[in-house]
Structure formats: C-alpha cells, structure tokens
Amino acid sequence: MQGYIQESDFNLVEEGFLARDLMEEIINEVSQTEDRDAFFVADLGDVVRKHLRFLKALPRVKPFYAVKCNSSKGVVKILAELGAGFDCASKTEIELVQDVGVAPERIIYANPCKQISQIKYAAKNGVQMMTFDNEVELSKVSRSHPNARMVLRIATDDSKSSARLSVKFGAPLKSCRRLLEMAKNLSVDVIGVSFHVGSGCTDSKAYTQAISDARLVFEMASEFGYKMWLLDIGGGFPGTEDSKIRFEEIAGVINPALDMYFPESSDVQIIAEPGRYYVASAFSLAVNVIAKKEVEHSVSDDEENESSKSIMYYVNDGVYGSFNCLVFDHAHPKPILHKKPSPDQPLYTSSLWGPTCDGLDQIAERVQLPELHVGDWLLFENMGAYTIAASSNFNGFQQSPVHYAMPRAAWKAVQLLQRGLQQTEEKENVCTPMSCGWEISDSLCFTRTFAATSII
C-alpha cells in the first residue's frame, strides 16, 4: 500500500453496508445530546467502485480528480491510494494534495488564468503541468515558471451542459496557431491540448468534436517543432444513476474518437478531469429540524379536501452551507424522511429553509410531507458534488462534518488494485484478479498505457 490512507481514517464496515446504516447509528448517538448538528456520511467504497468502473470504461484514460468538486481529505486520500492524478485550480488545492503526499508529477494546475504568486508557488513545489488559453498567461509563465509544461486549453461546444465553461475559458481554434507561435518565441514548452465540454454534459457528441479539434491543434503544433504527447479530455461525466446520460454511453463515444484521432501508436497519453463522477453519489447528508412555523390558509368549498395549512421547516444546514449546490450546480435535492410515516398520516404542503437570517436561504418549496417536529431528521442523497467545496460559515454556522465509511470488501479491492499498480512498474501487462466478490468486473488489467508514474 502507498500509505496515503489508513484504516483509522474511516469506519470499516461489513458487506451489505448502506450509508443509511451509518447515518442511523450517528443519529441515534447524537439524538442523546442537545447538539443534533447536520452531518455527512461518505461511502468511500462508492468512490472505489467508481474508479474501477472508470478504468474499465476508459482503459486508455488516466483520471486526474477535479479537487474543486469536493476537497474532503478522505476523498483525496483514497484517490491518491488508487493511483489517480489530481486537477488543481489554486495554490490551496495544490497544498492540500501535496500535504497528503502526492508527488507533483501527479498534479495538473488546470486553471488557464492564474495569479503570478501562485504560478511561482507551483514552480517552487515542482508542479510543472499547467493550462493556458491566452497570450498574457504565456508571458506570465515564461517569466515565473520557465520549466513549466504547458497545455493549451481550447474552447468547445458546451451548449448541452448544465454548467458552461467555454464562456470563460478556452482558446478558439483560430487563435491557437498564434498562441503556439508565441509560445515558441518565448521558449515555453507546450506538451498538449486540453478541453472541457462543461459540467453535467448531456451530449456525448461534444466529446467527439472536441477530440477532433484537439487533433487539429496537435498538427498546428508540429509546424512549430512541438511534439505534443498529452491530451486532457476534461470532465463533465455524470455521477448519479438518475442522470440523463450514463457514463458508459459517454465512454462509448470517447473511445472510438480517441482510436480515430489519437491511436495508441501515436504515443499520446490521455488524461481526464472527473469530479462529480467520483463523489456525487458517495455522500449523503442528514439535517435536523430546528424550528417550524405553520401558515394558515383559507379554504374554498371546492378545495375542502385539501389541507388548510402549510408548514415551514427550518433545518441546520442550508444554501450558505451544503445546499449551495442549488445556486451553483443547478441541483434539486429531495428530502427523505428518517422516520417512516404511518399510511394514514396526512400530507402538508411544506417548505424547507436553512438556518441563516437570509430570506434566500430556501432549500425546497412546496414539497408534500407529513407533519414533522423539532428534532426530527431529514436525509438527502447524492450530495457529494459541489456541496462541501463551496460551503461557507455565513452567520457563524459551521460546515457539516463528514463521517467516512469503507466496506471491508472495498478495502480489500483497494489493496488488490494497489498491488497491480506496483506490478505495472515491473511488467508491461499485468492482469490482477479481483476475487473479493465485490468488484464490477472479473479482472482488472493494468497496461503500460498509463501507469501512475508515467507522467514525469
């Protein structure tokens, strides 16, 4: 084992474990106290399962986890143990990853517009791979980080994505030749091309077009004497099963596009920047009802079967905390009752509100719930992406803590996977059986296509 994560970092649980089981234990424990604070349960086994699924679906692609999506220490540690790289966007994210013990060669500073002091920090700490999309960035890097290995980020069609990024980042194709020429004149090393089709992309064809465009930029670069060897296909992969498009569908489009434009014989190494893919479904959140208010309504004759009141519930996490995903990530979290109601309990039109003094701190509007009481719990699933990472301490409310769990079989799979990664350095093709009865495939093959140490 690499030693990035230890058994003391999580609760080791038996097979058949569900996040709900650990939540139940914690709820029972904290309900004996006055502090019934909101909390997360993170199933690291789900992260491991996603990693195996990624390697199977995109065998030529090395994942560089997008730290901005969820910077929880447990997530960073388990992905470091699994051999993933890391997509960092700031000095703070680089510090976080390197504090865990990750080598700088496994980090790409994937922010095309960086503060000069942070470029110098990357240089001082050995982080060489970084992205750019404009002339000013090239000038800054040439002065502040002469050993940088630059990756040209190109614009894409992200019109079918929930969070469009090309409005802010990415050079249009018509500008790429000029940027490459300038890089050559400044003696800046350009090693490859990157793109991002947007977060929450629902159009897999966007990847095909972007990969095709990247091939054109590779050809432009050769005109200036560059021999590019890296393609970064970004992220945007779905992280929950209820997404409009499945991850395997996207992979089914990416793989033939890579084979067409960047065949294995080209010796181009492929990386990606999955974020929500890894963590969205791994995190569940429990919140406690801290206050309630009934609102009476007049009822007409034709509405006599409807309730005459609605109820406002106030819970101890909100939009300024973990539910910032409503604002920044177009999320629509749905509450799950902790206590199963009786069939004859009436439902009331209800709204859920966070704990802060801001009237905008509303989690849900017009949801049908049985009557709840102060001290009751509500659960929310699929809360791992862009929740913790953007939460604040507004009004003095603290971020909800995370309790990590790892199924024993998943931990065994991590150990088997780690042995395979170590053997990769010694043999070109190794097939490590995954015989714990838990994994998604009968075997996991490791090839020299992208070993953990192959970016140097």
Swiss-Prot record:
Asked if the Swiss-Prot or TrEMBL record annotates the protein with the keyword Cytoplasm, the reply is yes
Q: Which UniProt keywords apply?
A: Cell projection, Cytoplasm, Cytoplasmic vesicle, Golgi apparatus, Membrane, Nucleus, Polyamine biosynthesis, Pyridoxal phosphate
Annotated coiled-coil segments of the chain: none
Organism superkingdom: Eukaryota
| UniProt site positions, description: Not modified | 68
BP terms from Gene Ontology: positive regulation of catalytic activity; positive regulation of polyamine transmembrane transport; putrescine biosynthetic process from arginine, via ornithine; trans-Golgi network membrane organization
**Primary residence:** nucleus
Identify one Gene Ontology CC term for this UniProt entry: cytoplasm
Q: How does it assemble?
A: Monomer. Interacts with OAZ1; this interaction disrupts the interaction between the antizyme and ODC1. Does not form a heterodimer with ODC1.
Q: Which family does it belong to?
A: Belongs to the Orn/Lys/Arg decarboxylase class-II family. ODC antizyme inhibitor subfamily.
Q: What does this protein do?
A: Antizyme inhibitor (AZI) protein that positively regulates ornithine decarboxylase (ODC) activity and polyamine uptake. AZI is an enzymatically inactive ODC homolog that counteracts the negative effect of ODC antizyme (AZ) on ODC activity by competing with ODC for antizyme-binding. Inhibits antizyme-dependent ODC degradation and releases ODC monomers from their inactive complex with antizymes, leading to formation of the catalytically active ODC homodimer and restoring polyamine production.
Free-text note on domains in this protein's UniProt record: The N-terminus domain is necessary for its localization to the ER-Golgi intermediate compartment (ERGIC).
Its protein name is Antizyme inhibitor 2
List the source organism: Xenopus laevis (African clawed frog)
